[in-house]
From Swiss-Prot:
Binding-site residues for L-cysteine, renumbered to this chain: G82, T122, H285
Metal-binding keyword on record: yes
Primary localization class, coarse: mitochondrion
Name the UniProt record assigns to this protein: Probable cysteine--tRNA ligase, mitochondrial
GO cellular component: mitochondrion
Gene: cars2
Species, as recorded: Xenopus tropicalis
Function: Mitochondrial cysteine-specific aminoacyl-tRNA synthetase that catalyzes the ATP-dependent ligation of cysteine to tRNA(Cys).
EC category name: ligase
Motif ('KIIK' region): 127-130
Motif annotated as 'HIGH' region, chain positions: 83-93
Record localization: Mitochondrion
Length: 572
Protein backbone atom coordinates (compact mmCIF):
# COMPACT_ATOMS: atom_id res chain seq x y z
CA UNK A 1 0.00 0.00 0.00
CA UNK A 2 2.86 2.41 0.74
CA UNK A 3 4.10 2.07 -2.86
CA UNK A 4 0.64 2.89 -4.16
CA UNK A 5 0.39 5.84 -1.82
CA UNK A 6 3.77 7.12 -3.02
CA UNK A 7 2.65 6.93 -6.65
CA UNK A 8 -0.56 8.75 -5.79
CA UNK A 9 1.30 11.58 -4.07
CA UNK A 10 3.77 11.98 -6.92
CA UNK A 11 1.04 12.38 -9.50
CA UNK A 12 0.36 8.96 -11.06
CA UNK A 13 -2.96 8.97 -12.87
CA UNK A 14 -5.00 6.84 -10.51
CA UNK A 15 -8.74 7.50 -10.33
CA UNK A 16 -9.40 10.70 -8.43
CA UNK A 17 -11.22 9.02 -5.55
CA UNK A 18 -8.25 6.69 -4.99
CA UNK A 19 -5.74 9.54 -5.13
CA UNK A 20 -7.65 11.58 -2.58
CA UNK A 21 -7.95 8.56 -0.31
CA UNK A 22 -4.24 7.87 -0.65
CA UNK A 23 -3.44 11.44 0.41
CA UNK A 24 -5.45 11.03 3.62
CA UNK A 25 -3.77 9.66 6.77
CA UNK A 26 -4.29 5.90 7.07
CA UNK A 27 -4.05 3.79 10.16
CA UNK A 28 -0.79 1.87 10.29
CA UNK A 29 0.70 3.65 7.29
CA UNK A 30 4.35 4.63 7.65
CA UNK A 31 5.52 8.14 6.81
CA UNK A 32 7.04 8.72 3.37
CA UNK A 33 8.15 11.63 1.23
CA UNK A 34 8.30 11.99 -2.55
CA UNK A 35 10.29 15.24 -2.45
CA UNK A 36 7.28 17.39 -3.25
CA UNK A 37 6.34 20.70 -1.66
CA UNK A 38 2.81 20.98 -0.26
CA UNK A 39 1.94 24.64 0.27
CA UNK A 40 -1.79 24.07 0.72
CA UNK A 41 -4.35 21.28 0.90
CA UNK A 42 -4.72 21.70 -2.89
CA UNK A 43 -1.85 19.35 -3.54
CA UNK A 44 1.88 19.04 -3.90
CA UNK A 45 4.36 20.69 -6.25
CA UNK A 46 7.12 18.53 -7.67
CA UNK A 47 10.39 20.05 -8.89
CA UNK A 48 10.43 19.46 -12.65
CA UNK A 49 13.17 17.37 -14.20
CA UNK A 50 15.72 19.15 -16.34
CA UNK A 51 18.42 21.80 -16.08
CA UNK A 52 18.87 23.87 -12.92
CA UNK A 53 19.49 27.42 -14.15
CA UNK A 54 20.99 28.60 -10.88
CA UNK A 55 18.11 31.06 -10.50
CA UNK A 56 15.62 30.98 -7.65
CA UNK A 57 12.14 32.38 -8.23
CA UNK A 58 9.29 33.04 -5.86
CA UNK A 59 6.70 30.49 -6.96
CA UNK A 60 3.14 31.36 -5.99
CA UNK A 61 2.28 27.64 -6.14
CA UNK A 62 4.62 26.83 -3.24
CA UNK A 63 4.75 30.28 -1.64
CA UNK A 64 8.51 30.11 -1.45
CA UNK A 65 11.59 30.51 -3.64
CA UNK A 66 12.20 27.46 -5.83
CA UNK A 67 15.08 26.66 -8.18
CA UNK A 68 14.15 27.49 -11.77
CA UNK A 69 14.50 24.17 -13.60
CA UNK A 70 13.94 24.04 -17.36
CA UNK A 71 13.68 21.10 -19.72
CA UNK A 72 15.84 23.04 -22.19
CA UNK A 73 18.66 25.05 -20.55
CA UNK A 74 18.44 27.77 -23.21
CA UNK A 75 14.66 28.16 -23.64
CA UNK A 76 11.76 28.87 -21.27
CA UNK A 77 8.12 28.57 -22.29
CA UNK A 78 6.16 31.52 -20.92
CA UNK A 79 2.46 32.33 -20.96
CA UNK A 80 1.40 35.86 -20.07
CA UNK A 81 -2.10 37.05 -19.37
CA UNK A 82 -2.66 40.00 -21.68
CA UNK A 83 -5.08 42.92 -21.86
CA UNK A 84 -8.84 42.98 -22.05
CA UNK A 85 -9.06 45.62 -24.74
CA UNK A 86 -11.95 47.93 -23.89
CA UNK A 87 -10.10 51.09 -22.76
CA UNK A 88 -6.66 52.70 -22.49
CA UNK A 89 -4.01 50.87 -20.47
CA UNK A 90 -3.24 52.52 -17.13
CA UNK A 91 -0.07 52.75 -15.08
CA UNK A 92 -0.98 49.71 -12.97
CA UNK A 93 -1.02 47.58 -16.11
CA UNK A 94 2.21 49.21 -17.29
CA UNK A 95 3.98 48.46 -14.02
CA UNK A 96 3.23 44.75 -14.31
CA UNK A 97 4.28 44.50 -17.96
CA UNK A 98 7.48 46.51 -17.44
CA UNK A 99 8.44 44.39 -14.43
CA UNK A 100 8.02 41.18 -16.41
CA UNK A 101 9.85 42.74 -19.35
CA UNK A 102 12.79 43.36 -17.03
CA UNK A 103 12.74 39.70 -15.94
CA UNK A 104 12.60 38.57 -19.56
CA UNK A 105 15.62 40.74 -20.44
CA UNK A 106 17.58 39.41 -17.44
CA UNK A 107 16.86 35.80 -18.41
CA UNK A 108 18.17 36.40 -21.93
CA UNK A 109 21.07 38.80 -21.41
CA UNK A 110 22.42 37.58 -18.07
CA UNK A 111 21.61 33.86 -18.11
CA UNK A 112 21.36 33.14 -21.83
CA UNK A 113 17.78 31.86 -21.58
CA UNK A 114 15.55 32.76 -24.49
CA UNK A 115 11.83 32.99 -23.79
CA UNK A 116 8.98 31.91 -26.02
CA UNK A 117 6.23 34.22 -24.81
CA UNK A 118 2.57 33.87 -25.72
CA UNK A 119 0.21 36.66 -24.71
CA UNK A 120 -3.55 36.45 -25.09
CA UNK A 121 -5.60 39.45 -26.14
CA UNK A 122 -9.11 39.17 -24.71
CA UNK A 123 -11.18 40.77 -27.45
CA UNK A 124 -14.59 39.50 -26.35
CA UNK A 125 -15.78 40.10 -22.80
CA UNK A 126 -18.64 41.61 -20.79
CA UNK A 127 -16.70 44.88 -20.40
CA UNK A 128 -16.06 45.09 -24.14
CA UNK A 129 -19.73 44.48 -24.94
CA UNK A 130 -20.86 47.08 -22.39
CA UNK A 131 -18.41 49.74 -23.58
CA UNK A 132 -19.24 49.11 -27.25
CA UNK A 133 -22.93 49.69 -26.51
CA UNK A 134 -22.10 52.94 -24.69
CA UNK A 135 -20.10 54.19 -27.68
CA UNK A 136 -22.55 52.77 -30.24
CA UNK A 137 -19.88 50.84 -32.10
CA UNK A 138 -19.32 47.14 -32.67
CA UNK A 139 -17.37 45.12 -30.07
CA UNK A 140 -14.92 44.14 -32.82
CA UNK A 141 -14.20 47.77 -33.74
CA UNK A 142 -13.75 48.70 -30.08
CA UNK A 143 -11.44 45.77 -29.40
CA UNK A 144 -9.26 46.40 -32.45
CA UNK A 145 -8.91 50.09 -31.55
CA UNK A 146 -7.76 49.44 -28.00
CA UNK A 147 -5.63 46.45 -28.94
CA UNK A 148 -3.59 48.74 -31.19
CA UNK A 149 -3.59 51.37 -28.45
CA UNK A 150 -2.20 48.84 -25.96
CA UNK A 151 0.58 47.80 -28.34
CA UNK A 152 1.52 51.44 -28.92
CA UNK A 153 1.72 52.02 -25.16
CA UNK A 154 3.94 48.97 -24.69
CA UNK A 155 6.23 50.13 -27.49
CA UNK A 156 6.43 53.59 -25.91
CA UNK A 157 7.44 51.96 -22.61
CA UNK A 158 10.07 49.84 -24.42
CA UNK A 159 8.38 46.57 -23.45
CA UNK A 160 9.52 43.78 -25.76
CA UNK A 161 6.58 42.33 -27.70
CA UNK A 162 5.67 38.70 -26.98
CA UNK A 163 6.75 36.06 -29.43
CA UNK A 164 3.13 36.00 -30.54
CA UNK A 165 -0.12 37.74 -29.63
CA UNK A 166 -3.20 35.50 -29.83
CA UNK A 167 -6.77 36.81 -29.92
CA UNK A 168 -9.57 34.95 -28.22
CA UNK A 169 -11.96 35.43 -31.15
CA UNK A 170 -9.50 33.73 -33.51
CA UNK A 171 -9.44 30.60 -31.33
CA UNK A 172 -13.14 29.85 -30.79
CA UNK A 173 -13.08 26.40 -32.50
CA UNK A 174 -10.11 25.37 -30.36
CA UNK A 175 -11.90 26.61 -27.22
CA UNK A 176 -15.03 24.61 -28.04
CA UNK A 177 -12.93 21.48 -28.62
CA UNK A 178 -11.09 22.07 -25.34
CA UNK A 179 -14.38 22.30 -23.45
CA UNK A 180 -15.70 19.13 -25.08
CA UNK A 181 -12.59 17.27 -23.95
CA UNK A 182 -13.00 18.45 -20.34
CA UNK A 183 -16.63 17.30 -20.37
CA UNK A 184 -15.57 13.92 -21.78
CA UNK A 185 -13.03 13.57 -18.98
CA UNK A 186 -15.79 14.07 -16.41
CA UNK A 187 -14.82 17.50 -15.08
CA UNK A 188 -17.53 19.72 -16.60
CA UNK A 189 -21.24 19.64 -17.40
CA UNK A 190 -23.66 21.39 -19.74
CA UNK A 191 -27.00 22.77 -18.57
CA UNK A 192 -30.38 23.04 -20.20
CA UNK A 193 -29.87 26.80 -20.59
CA UNK A 194 -26.87 26.31 -22.89
CA UNK A 195 -24.17 27.04 -20.32
CA UNK A 196 -21.18 24.82 -19.55
CA UNK A 197 -19.60 24.84 -16.09
CA UNK A 198 -16.48 23.34 -14.63
CA UNK A 199 -17.37 20.95 -11.80
CA UNK A 200 -15.03 22.10 -9.04
CA UNK A 201 -16.08 19.30 -6.69
CA UNK A 202 -14.88 16.76 -9.27
CA UNK A 203 -11.25 17.59 -8.51
CA UNK A 204 -11.72 17.65 -4.76
CA UNK A 205 -8.94 19.18 -2.68
CA UNK A 206 -6.78 19.82 -5.73
CA UNK A 207 -8.73 23.07 -6.14
CA UNK A 208 -7.42 25.93 -4.03
CA UNK A 209 -3.73 26.19 -4.90
CA UNK A 210 -3.84 29.99 -4.54
CA UNK A 211 -6.76 30.28 -2.13
CA UNK A 212 -7.83 27.43 0.12
CA UNK A 213 -10.29 29.38 2.30
CA UNK A 214 -13.54 28.09 0.84
CA UNK A 215 -16.81 27.28 2.51
CA UNK A 216 -18.50 24.05 1.49
CA UNK A 217 -21.76 25.12 3.12
CA UNK A 218 -22.71 27.61 0.41
CA UNK A 219 -25.43 26.46 -1.96
CA UNK A 220 -26.13 27.58 -5.49
CA UNK A 221 -28.11 30.73 -6.05
CA UNK A 222 -31.56 30.08 -7.44
CA UNK A 223 -30.92 32.55 -10.27
CA UNK A 224 -28.15 30.41 -11.74
CA UNK A 225 -28.16 26.94 -13.24
CA UNK A 226 -24.85 25.58 -11.98
CA UNK A 227 -24.60 22.82 -9.41
CA UNK A 228 -22.40 24.55 -6.87
CA UNK A 229 -21.43 28.12 -6.10
CA UNK A 230 -17.74 27.46 -6.83
CA UNK A 231 -18.39 26.10 -10.32
CA UNK A 232 -17.33 28.55 -13.02
CA UNK A 233 -18.38 29.07 -16.62
CA UNK A 234 -16.54 27.52 -19.54
CA UNK A 235 -19.21 28.54 -22.05
CA UNK A 236 -21.94 31.16 -21.58
CA UNK A 237 -25.17 31.23 -23.51
CA UNK A 238 -25.60 34.43 -25.48
CA UNK A 239 -27.95 37.23 -24.49
CA UNK A 240 -30.00 39.25 -26.98
CA UNK A 241 -27.90 41.58 -29.18
CA UNK A 242 -24.61 40.09 -27.93
CA UNK A 243 -21.93 38.50 -30.13
CA UNK A 244 -22.14 34.71 -30.25
CA UNK A 245 -20.71 31.60 -31.86
CA UNK A 246 -22.43 28.33 -32.65
CA UNK A 247 -21.51 25.43 -30.36
CA UNK A 248 -22.79 21.97 -29.38
CA UNK A 249 -24.57 23.69 -26.47
CA UNK A 250 -26.18 26.44 -28.52
CA UNK A 251 -25.23 30.02 -29.36
CA UNK A 252 -22.83 31.55 -26.88
CA UNK A 253 -19.29 32.68 -26.13
CA UNK A 254 -16.40 31.44 -24.00
CA UNK A 255 -15.93 32.09 -20.31
CA UNK A 256 -12.95 34.16 -19.23
CA UNK A 257 -10.72 31.42 -17.79
CA UNK A 258 -11.08 28.85 -20.58
CA UNK A 259 -9.57 31.25 -23.12
CA UNK A 260 -6.14 31.25 -21.47
CA UNK A 261 -6.11 27.50 -20.81
CA UNK A 262 -6.94 26.72 -24.42
CA UNK A 263 -4.49 29.13 -26.00
CA UNK A 264 -1.62 28.22 -23.66
CA UNK A 265 -2.21 24.51 -24.26
CA UNK A 266 -2.54 24.95 -28.03
CA UNK A 267 1.01 26.34 -28.15
CA UNK A 268 2.83 24.68 -25.26
CA UNK A 269 0.92 21.43 -24.79
CA UNK A 270 0.65 19.75 -21.41
CA UNK A 271 3.70 21.38 -19.79
CA UNK A 272 4.44 25.06 -19.19
CA UNK A 273 7.53 26.54 -17.56
CA UNK A 274 6.43 30.03 -16.51
CA UNK A 275 3.02 31.67 -16.13
CA UNK A 276 2.80 35.37 -15.25
CA UNK A 277 0.24 38.01 -14.34
CA UNK A 278 -0.76 40.50 -11.68
CA UNK A 279 -1.38 39.23 -8.16
CA UNK A 280 -5.10 40.00 -8.56
CA UNK A 281 -5.25 37.29 -11.25
CA UNK A 282 -3.96 34.51 -8.99
CA UNK A 283 -7.47 33.76 -7.77
CA UNK A 284 -9.78 32.94 -9.33
CA UNK A 285 -8.31 33.31 -12.83
CA UNK A 286 -5.06 31.37 -12.55
CA UNK A 287 -6.62 28.91 -10.12
CA UNK A 288 -9.28 28.11 -12.70
CA UNK A 289 -6.75 27.96 -15.53
CA UNK A 290 -4.83 25.28 -13.65
CA UNK A 291 -8.00 23.30 -12.90
CA UNK A 292 -9.04 23.37 -16.56
CA UNK A 293 -5.61 22.41 -17.92
CA UNK A 294 -5.05 19.59 -15.45
CA UNK A 295 -8.56 18.29 -16.20
CA UNK A 296 -7.89 18.46 -19.94
CA UNK A 297 -4.39 16.95 -19.85
CA UNK A 298 -5.20 14.51 -17.01
CA UNK A 299 -2.13 15.77 -15.16
CA UNK A 300 -1.36 17.01 -11.66
CA UNK A 301 1.17 19.72 -12.53
CA UNK A 302 0.54 21.67 -15.72
CA UNK A 303 2.46 24.88 -14.97
CA UNK A 304 5.69 24.72 -13.00
CA UNK A 305 6.18 28.35 -11.93
CA UNK A 306 3.58 31.06 -11.37
CA UNK A 307 5.03 34.56 -10.96
CA UNK A 308 2.82 37.44 -9.85
CA UNK A 309 3.52 41.17 -9.69
CA UNK A 310 2.34 43.29 -6.80
CA UNK A 311 -0.21 46.07 -7.17
CA UNK A 312 0.62 49.66 -7.96
CA UNK A 313 -1.39 52.13 -5.91
CA UNK A 314 -1.50 55.89 -5.56
CA UNK A 315 0.03 57.53 -2.50
CA UNK A 316 -2.49 57.68 0.33
CA UNK A 317 -4.71 55.07 -1.32
CA UNK A 318 -4.22 51.43 -0.36
CA UNK A 319 -6.49 50.25 -3.17
CA UNK A 320 -4.80 49.03 -6.35
CA UNK A 321 -4.90 51.32 -9.38
CA UNK A 322 -8.04 50.24 -11.22
CA UNK A 323 -10.46 51.53 -13.83
CA UNK A 324 -13.38 50.29 -11.77
CA UNK A 325 -12.20 52.37 -8.80
CA UNK A 326 -11.52 55.39 -11.03
CA UNK A 327 -8.14 55.95 -9.36
CA UNK A 328 -5.94 55.42 -12.37
CA UNK A 329 -3.53 57.32 -14.62
CA UNK A 330 -3.27 56.25 -18.25
CA UNK A 331 0.09 55.48 -19.81
CA UNK A 332 -0.34 58.35 -22.25
CA UNK A 333 -1.07 60.82 -19.46
CA UNK A 334 1.95 59.62 -17.52
CA UNK A 335 4.32 59.97 -20.48
CA UNK A 336 3.47 63.66 -20.72
CA UNK A 337 5.35 64.16 -17.45
CA UNK A 338 7.97 61.41 -17.28
CA UNK A 339 10.01 59.32 -19.69
CA UNK A 340 9.86 55.54 -20.24
CA UNK A 341 13.34 55.14 -18.72
CA UNK A 342 12.30 57.03 -15.60
CA UNK A 343 9.30 54.75 -15.15
CA UNK A 344 11.49 51.71 -15.74
CA UNK A 345 13.86 52.89 -12.99
CA UNK A 346 10.81 53.41 -10.75
CA UNK A 347 9.90 49.75 -11.36
CA UNK A 348 13.47 48.60 -10.73
CA UNK A 349 13.56 50.23 -7.30
CA UNK A 350 11.08 47.70 -5.87
CA UNK A 351 10.83 43.91 -6.02
CA UNK A 352 8.54 42.78 -8.80
CA UNK A 353 6.23 40.85 -6.47
CA UNK A 354 5.87 43.73 -3.99
CA UNK A 355 3.14 46.34 -3.95
CA UNK A 356 4.52 49.73 -4.93
CA UNK A 357 3.31 53.25 -4.19
CA UNK A 358 3.18 55.76 -7.03
CA UNK A 359 3.69 59.43 -6.22
CA UNK A 360 5.60 62.43 -7.52
CA UNK A 361 8.12 61.79 -4.77
CA UNK A 362 8.73 58.17 -5.76
CA UNK A 363 9.04 59.18 -9.41
CA UNK A 364 11.52 61.93 -8.61
CA UNK A 365 13.59 59.39 -6.67
CA UNK A 366 13.80 57.40 -9.89
CA UNK A 367 14.63 60.55 -11.87
CA UNK A 368 17.40 61.45 -9.44
CA UNK A 369 18.84 57.93 -9.61
CA UNK A 370 19.11 58.15 -13.39
CA UNK A 371 20.60 61.63 -13.14
CA UNK A 372 23.25 60.43 -10.68
CA UNK A 373 24.21 57.61 -13.04
CA UNK A 374 24.28 59.88 -16.08
CA UNK A 375 26.35 62.53 -14.29
CA UNK A 376 28.91 59.98 -13.14
CA UNK A 377 29.30 58.55 -16.64
CA UNK A 378 29.69 62.08 -18.01
CA UNK A 379 32.32 62.98 -15.40
CA UNK A 380 34.18 59.71 -15.91
CA UNK A 381 34.31 60.32 -19.67
CA UNK A 382 35.57 63.87 -19.04
CA UNK A 383 38.31 62.42 -16.83
CA UNK A 384 39.29 59.96 -19.55
CA UNK A 385 39.49 62.80 -22.10
CA UNK A 386 41.67 64.88 -19.79
CA UNK A 387 38.94 67.48 -19.35
CA UNK A 388 38.58 66.77 -15.62
CA UNK A 389 41.77 67.10 -13.58
CA UNK A 390 41.72 65.03 -10.40
CA UNK A 391 43.98 63.91 -7.61
CA UNK A 392 45.73 60.54 -8.09
CA UNK A 393 43.15 57.71 -8.20
CA UNK A 394 43.32 54.59 -6.01
CA UNK A 395 43.05 52.35 -9.04
CA UNK A 396 43.38 48.99 -7.27
CA UNK A 397 40.49 49.88 -4.97
CA UNK A 398 38.24 50.78 -7.91
CA UNK A 399 39.06 47.53 -9.73
CA UNK A 400 38.15 45.65 -6.56
CA UNK A 401 34.86 47.56 -6.23
CA UNK A 402 34.01 46.89 -9.87
CA UNK A 403 34.61 43.15 -9.57
CA UNK A 404 32.59 43.00 -6.34
CA UNK A 405 29.74 44.85 -8.04
CA UNK A 406 29.64 42.35 -10.90
CA UNK A 407 29.41 39.47 -8.43
CA UNK A 408 26.76 41.20 -6.31
CA UNK A 409 24.60 42.12 -9.30
CA UNK A 410 24.68 38.56 -10.66
CA UNK A 411 23.78 37.22 -7.21
CA UNK A 412 20.88 39.68 -6.95
CA UNK A 413 19.53 38.68 -10.36
CA UNK A 414 19.83 35.00 -9.40
CA UNK A 415 17.80 35.62 -6.25
CA UNK A 416 14.30 36.06 -7.68
CA UNK A 417 15.41 38.91 -9.96
CA UNK A 418 16.14 41.24 -7.03
CA UNK A 419 16.50 44.46 -9.03
CA UNK A 420 16.56 46.85 -6.02
CA UNK A 421 19.63 45.04 -4.69
CA UNK A 422 21.26 45.10 -8.13
CA UNK A 423 20.64 48.83 -8.56
CA UNK A 424 21.97 49.51 -5.06
CA UNK A 425 25.16 47.61 -5.91
CA UNK A 426 25.72 49.76 -9.01
CA UNK A 427 24.93 52.97 -7.11
CA UNK A 428 27.50 51.97 -4.48
CA UNK A 429 30.08 51.53 -7.24
CA UNK A 430 29.22 55.00 -8.56
CA UNK A 431 29.57 56.42 -5.05
CA UNK A 432 33.12 55.10 -4.78
CA UNK A 433 33.92 56.25 -8.30
CA UNK A 434 32.66 59.76 -7.58
CA UNK A 435 34.70 60.01 -4.38
CA UNK A 436 37.87 59.90 -6.45
CA UNK A 437 36.72 62.27 -9.19
CA UNK A 438 37.39 65.38 -7.13
CA UNK A 439 38.51 68.23 -9.37
CA UNK A 440 41.78 69.99 -8.54
CA UNK A 441 43.23 73.17 -10.04
CA UNK A 442 46.57 71.70 -11.11
CA UNK A 443 47.36 68.30 -12.56
CA UNK A 444 49.93 66.20 -10.71
CA UNK A 445 52.72 64.28 -12.35
CA UNK A 446 51.08 60.98 -11.40
CA UNK A 447 49.76 58.83 -14.27
CA UNK A 448 46.02 59.05 -14.88
CA UNK A 449 43.83 55.96 -14.36
CA UNK A 450 41.62 56.15 -17.45
CA UNK A 451 41.27 52.40 -17.99
CA UNK A 452 39.49 51.60 -14.74
CA UNK A 453 36.99 54.40 -15.32
CA UNK A 454 36.47 53.17 -18.87
CA UNK A 455 35.72 49.70 -17.50
CA UNK A 456 33.26 51.17 -15.00
CA UNK A 457 31.49 53.15 -17.73
CA UNK A 458 31.28 50.06 -19.93
CA UNK A 459 29.83 47.92 -17.13
CA UNK A 460 27.27 50.54 -16.04
CA UNK A 461 26.08 51.11 -19.60
CA UNK A 462 25.84 47.34 -20.11
CA UNK A 463 23.90 46.99 -16.85
CA UNK A 464 21.38 49.62 -17.95
CA UNK A 465 21.12 48.14 -21.44
CA UNK A 466 20.29 44.73 -19.95
CA UNK A 467 17.39 46.32 -18.09
CA UNK A 468 16.15 48.31 -21.09
CA UNK A 469 17.45 51.76 -20.12
CA UNK A 470 19.47 54.08 -22.35
CA UNK A 471 21.52 56.95 -20.99
CA UNK A 472 20.33 60.30 -22.35
CA UNK A 473 23.66 61.02 -24.04
CA UNK A 474 23.38 57.79 -26.00
CA UNK A 475 19.90 58.75 -27.12
CA UNK A 476 21.44 61.66 -29.03
CA UNK A 477 23.18 59.16 -31.30
CA UNK A 478 22.19 59.67 -34.87
CA UNK A 479 18.70 58.25 -35.07
CA UNK A 480 18.59 60.25 -38.30
CA UNK A 481 20.65 62.83 -40.12
CA UNK A 482 19.02 65.75 -38.29
CA UNK A 483 19.98 64.40 -34.85
CA UNK A 484 23.61 64.07 -35.93
CA UNK A 485 23.65 67.65 -37.24
CA UNK A 486 22.14 69.02 -34.03
CA UNK A 487 24.67 67.09 -31.96
CA UNK A 488 27.54 68.70 -33.87
CA UNK A 489 25.95 72.16 -33.57
CA UNK A 490 25.83 71.82 -29.77
CA UNK A 491 29.43 70.61 -29.73
CA UNK A 492 30.59 73.69 -31.66
CA UNK A 493 28.50 76.01 -29.48
CA UNK A 494 29.96 74.62 -26.25
CA UNK A 495 33.48 74.82 -27.66
CA UNK A 496 32.98 78.48 -28.65
CA UNK A 497 31.49 79.32 -25.25
CA UNK A 498 34.44 77.66 -23.52
CA UNK A 499 36.91 79.85 -25.43
CA UNK A 500 34.96 83.01 -24.59
CA UNK A 501 34.74 81.98 -20.94
CA UNK A 502 38.48 81.34 -20.69
CA UNK A 503 39.13 84.76 -22.24
CA UNK A 504 36.72 86.39 -19.76
CA UNK A 505 38.52 84.65 -16.88
CA UNK A 506 41.89 85.88 -18.19
CA UNK A 507 43.03 82.28 -18.04
CA UNK A 508 45.84 82.87 -20.56
CA UNK A 509 47.35 85.85 -18.75
CA UNK A 510 49.51 83.80 -16.38
CA UNK A 511 53.13 85.18 -16.33
CA UNK A 512 56.13 83.04 -17.10
CA UNK A 513 58.12 84.52 -14.22
CA UNK A 514 57.24 83.50 -10.70
CA UNK A 515 58.97 86.23 -8.69
CA UNK A 516 57.07 88.01 -5.92
CA UNK A 517 56.93 91.32 -7.81
CA UNK A 518 55.74 89.61 -10.99
CA UNK A 519 53.04 87.75 -9.06
CA UNK A 520 51.74 91.00 -7.62
CA UNK A 521 51.70 92.64 -11.05
CA UNK A 522 49.87 89.62 -12.49
CA UNK A 523 47.20 89.72 -9.78
CA UNK A 524 46.56 93.40 -10.39
CA UNK A 525 46.44 93.00 -14.16
CA UNK A 526 44.11 90.01 -13.90
CA UNK A 527 41.80 91.91 -11.55
CA UNK A 528 41.49 94.69 -14.11
CA UNK A 529 40.88 92.22 -16.93
CA UNK A 530 38.17 90.40 -14.96
CA UNK A 531 36.36 93.69 -14.40
CA UNK A 532 36.60 94.62 -18.08
CA UNK A 533 35.48 91.19 -19.26
CA UNK A 534 32.73 90.64 -16.66
CA UNK A 535 29.94 91.13 -19.28
CA UNK A 536 31.40 88.24 -21.32
CA UNK A 537 31.40 85.97 -18.27
CA UNK A 538 27.80 86.93 -17.50
CA UNK A 539 26.84 86.17 -21.10
CA UNK A 540 28.41 82.70 -20.75
CA UNK A 541 26.41 82.08 -17.59
CA UNK A 542 23.19 83.23 -19.28
CA UNK A 543 23.86 80.91 -22.21
CA UNK A 544 24.33 77.99 -19.81
CA UNK A 545 21.02 78.81 -18.14
CA UNK A 546 19.19 79.09 -21.47
CA UNK A 547 20.60 75.79 -22.71
CA UNK A 548 19.46 74.12 -19.47
CA UNK A 549 15.87 75.00 -20.40
CA UNK A 550 16.27 72.74 -23.43
CA UNK A 551 17.79 69.91 -21.40
CA UNK A 552 21.45 70.69 -22.23
CA UNK A 553 23.45 70.66 -19.02
CA UNK A 554 26.80 72.48 -19.39
CA UNK A 555 29.55 71.68 -16.90
CA UNK A 556 32.53 74.04 -16.61
CA UNK A 557 35.64 72.16 -15.52
CA UNK A 558 38.56 74.53 -15.09
CA UNK A 559 39.64 75.57 -18.58
CA UNK A 560 37.30 73.16 -20.38
CA UNK A 561 33.54 72.69 -20.64
CA UNK A 562 31.49 69.57 -21.31
CA UNK A 563 27.80 68.96 -21.79
CA UNK A 564 25.17 66.29 -21.37
CA UNK A 565 21.63 65.97 -22.58
CA UNK A 566 19.07 65.63 -19.81
CA UNK A 567 15.44 64.68 -20.22
CA UNK A 568 13.40 67.86 -19.83
CA UNK A 569 10.75 65.81 -18.04
CA UNK A 570 13.12 65.61 -15.07
CA UNK A 571 12.03 69.14 -14.19
CA UNK A 572 8.36 68.16 -13.79
Amino acid sequence: MNALMRRACCGALFPLSFRLAALSPMKGASNFSCGNVCASPAGCWAPPSGHDTGIKVYNSLTRRKDPLILADPTVATWYSCGPTVYDHAHLGHACSYVRFDIIRRILLKVFGIDTVVVMVVTDIDDKIIKRAKELNISPVALARTYEQDFKQDMTALKVLPPTVYMRVTENIPQIISFIEHIIANGYAYATSQGNVYFDVQSIGERYGKFNDSFSDTASESASQDKRHIRDFALWKTSKPEEPYWASPWGKGRPGWHIECSTIASSVFGKHLDIHTGGIDLAFPHHENEIAQCEAYHQSTQWGNYFLHTGHLHLKGNEEKMSKSLRNYLTVKEFLKSFSPDQFRMFCLRSKYKSAVEYSNGSMHDAVNTLHTISSFVDDAKAYMKGQLICQPVQEALLWQRLNETKVNVKAAFSDDFDTPRAVDAVMDLIHHGNRQLKAVSKESNSPRSSVVYGAMISYIEQFLEILGISLSQNQVAAEDRHSAVLFNVVEEMISFRSKVRNYALAADESPNAIGQEEKQQYKERRRQLLLEREPLLQACDIMRQHLAVYGINVKDRGNTSTWELLDRKEET
